[in-house]
Amino acid sequence: MARIAGINIPDHKHTVIALTSIFGIGKTRSQAICAATGIAEDVKISELSEEQIDKLRDEVAKFVVEGDLRREVTLSIKRLMDLGTYRGLRHRRGLPVRGQRTKTNARTRKGPRKPIKK
């Protein structure tokens, strides 16, 4: 297994699909990485030479991925909560942030129903 950005990339998958196993790299970005390195998208990771894998590592290193990206997202949400913005309050209360209705639905964010005690 090739190791890129601290993640074991699956050998049996095509390069474009395998790169998406890294947090922060989706299909479009993985296609751009393949184009920049000159590696065909339909080549499997196991068929790549060590030199090609090094090229992929260098290209992926240009982006914010994995732990750094997770930390960045967490800090931006924490910043919203500290500022006391509306979005921060919604995050703190565990409610939908982007204006969805909450009278019905929103069960994923709100959690299981709490029965009314008589």
From Swiss-Prot:
Keywords: Ribonucleoprotein, Ribosomal protein, RNA-binding, rRNA-binding, tRNA-binding. Residues 92-118 are annotated as: Disordered. The keyword Transferase does not apply. InterPro entries: Rbsml_uS13_C (IPR027437), Ribosomal_uS13 (IPR001892), Ribosomal_uS13-like_H2TH (IPR010979), Ribosomal_uS13_bac-type (IPR019980), Ribosomal_uS13_CS (IPR018269). GO terms for cellular component: cytosol; small ribosomal subunit. One of its GO terms (molecular function) is rRNA binding. GO terms for biological process: translation. It holds the Pfam family Ribosomal_S13. Transmembrane segments: none annotated. Located at the top of the head of the 30S subunit, it contacts several helices of the 16S rRNA. In the 70S ribosome it contacts the 23S rRNA (bridge B1a) and protein L5 of the 50S subunit (bridge B1b), connecting the 2 subunits; these bridges are implicated in subunit movement. Contacts the tRNAs in the A and P-sites. Part of the 30S ribosomal subunit. Forms a loose heterodimer with protein S19. Forms two bridges to the 50S subunit in the 70S ribosome. Belongs to the universal ribosomal protein uS13 family. This is Small ribosomal subunit protein uS13. It comes from Pectobacterium carotovorum subsp. carotovorum (strain PC1). The lineage of its organism: Bacteria, Pseudomonadati, Pseudomonadota, Gammaproteobacteria, Enterobacterales. The gene is rpsM.
